Amino acid sequence: MVQRGSKVRILRPESYWFQDVGTVASVDQSGIKYPVIVRFDKVNYAGINTNNFAVDELIEVEAPKAKAKK
């Protein structure tokens, strides 16, 4: 399950970040076509480091780390 904080691999071939790993910044639940915003370490040609993807264009590589209890 892709959720905020997950590390994901990109499967969209036309994407600048194809086969790269990024971190999920947010997941929109409203029913839009590309609900997952992914943030990357490197920027593309336009200087952008985030992009929206569909859930089926992503593979979760690592689950988010659990928050430490106080």
Swiss-Prot record:
The keyword Thylakoid applies. It is found in: Cellular thylakoid membrane. It is a peripheral membrane protein. One of its GO terms (cellular component) is photosystem I reaction center. It holds the Pfam family PSI_PsaE. One of its GO terms (biological process) is photosynthesis. Its main location: membrane. Keywords: Membrane, Photosynthesis, Photosystem I, Thylakoid. The keyword Transmembrane helix does not apply. The cyanobacterial PSI reaction center is composed of one copy each of PsaA,B,C,D,E,F,I,J,K,L,M and X, and forms dimeric and tetrameric complexes. Stabilizes the interaction between PsaC and the PSI core, assists the docking of the ferredoxin to PSI and interacts with ferredoxin-NADP oxidoreductase. Belongs to the PsaE family. This is Photosystem I reaction center subunit IV.
